[in-house]
Amino acid sequence: KERAMHVGRKKGQIVDTVVQEQRPSVLLELGAYCGYSAVRMARLLLPSARLLTIELNPDNAAIAQQVVDFAGLQDRVTVVVGASQDIIPQLKKKYDVDTLDMVFLDHWKDRYLPDTLLLEECGLLRKGTVLLADNVICPGAPDFLAHVRGCGRFECTHFSSYLEYSQMVDGLEKAVYKGPGSPAQP
């Protein structure tokens, strides 16, 4: 059974709220798919802000670019084709990113933790950077959840919801980076 893999309306409202609260100047999305969430988030950004969205599948990236162009948001959104683990280390030099204000994780769930660690290792997270991860319950990202909730460097909030267009329990995890030296809380 196939399903639409975008964030959907209900979880999209949670994403909207987080973007509106954070007001990011530089937002990174991991997993563009068809461009739905990129457009959804970019429409809420200030005109001077930018969103970079990384998509592994070139066909999906081409569709995402068309959707972004159709929405008139091509000045704010850059669609980057490639593997997240290859692109993240290039963000500072090739894409002129100092640090990220927000990261929306919605790609391969087994990449959530390695990419979070890579973002930190590359110096792209700053105190206050918000990670917002979709589908942390279904299909799930247990290693990511264990890390952000247990390492002491993130302040976490869970938003319960349902998998897009179904009644399967799912959720988003908001993890606010406290800095590299934050001690674990007992």
Curated annotation (Swiss-Prot):
Enzyme class at the top of the EC tree: transferase
Keywords, A to Z, come to: Catecholamine metabolism, Cell membrane, Cytoplasm, Lipid metabolism, Magnesium, Membrane, Metal-binding, Methyltransferase, Neurotransmitter degradation, Phosphoprotein, S-adenosyl-L-methionine, Transferase
State which Enzyme Commission number(s) the record gives.
Answer: 2.1.1.6
Gene Ontology cellular component terms for the protein in this record = axon; cytosol; dendrite; membrane; plasma membrane
Cofactor(s) this protein cannot do without: Mg(2+)
Q: Secreted among the record's keywords?
A: no
Q: One GO BP annotation here?
A: dopamine metabolic process
Indicate what this protein is called per its UniProt record: Catechol O-methyltransferase
Native species: Sus scrofa
| Source lineage | Eukaryota, Metazoa, Chordata, Craniata, Vertebrata
